Every structure is written in structure tokens, then in C-alpha cells.
């Protein structure tokens, strides 16, 4: 996990039985809205 001083965070979770990597990252916009992205890297 990584979090920067300006509020960006990133987490990568190890592969599953198919070798896919799961993770998420996010930040807070200038307007104060939280943005969170969750992904599966499968290729």
C-alpha cells in the first residue's frame, strides 16, 4: 500500500488462482469528492 501526502492512495493485492492482480487506487478531487477505482489486471 502507498499513500502520498496529497491524498492519493494505491493498493495492489497478489494474484488469484488465474494470476490476476487485484487492486485499487483513489484520490479526493479539488471539490472534495472521493474517487475510488478498483481493478483486475488479467492480461
Swiss-Prot record:
Entries under PROSITE patterns matching the protein: CHIT_BIND_RR_2
Name under which the protein is recorded: Larval cuticle protein SC1
GO molecular function: structural constituent of cuticle
Keyword terms, alphabetized: Cuticle
All residue ranges annotated as the Chitin-binding type R&R domain in the record: 1-43
Range of residues in the leader sequence: none
Taxonomic superkingdom: Eukaryota
Record's function text: Component of the cuticle of the larva of flesh fly.
Amino acid at each position: 500500500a502507498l499513500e502520498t501526502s496529497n491524498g492519493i492512495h494505491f493498493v495492489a493485492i497478489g494474484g488469484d488462482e488465474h494470476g490476476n492482480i487485484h487492486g485499487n487506487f483513489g484520490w479526493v478531487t479539488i471539490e472534495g469528492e472521493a474517487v475510488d477505482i478498483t481493478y483486475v489486471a488479467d492480461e
